[in-house]
């Protein structure tokens, strides 16, 4: 498996399994199969409504001998929760659904509304612990520069 080193020093597999448009009832089986054939990066999102299935599959994999540290789990904050306080609540809700002690990467799904507030929330989560790296998907270059300055 090849990895990409993130700015915080953590390593992320360059190939992952995403569960976009995977029915919630099928997510657990699909992710179990993906982990079984060697995928270690699993990508979900609040808006996919299948975080619980992903979490159940991770628990099954760990019970079967896969170490949590081998897995790289990412989820995304949906646009309805892009503000500092709502992002913190949404993170807690995602963690509860996933049933994980920590998350490897938390993405702002799309940069609408209070992106800077959501970024501040992610910085707070990182400082609090839990191993959260943060990033923004689908983001214009100018906003990336501004967020880089805020870090």
Predicted feature locations:
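A cross-family glycoside hydrolase active-site/sugar-binding cleft signature
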Residues: 18-20, 45, 74-76, 106-109, ...
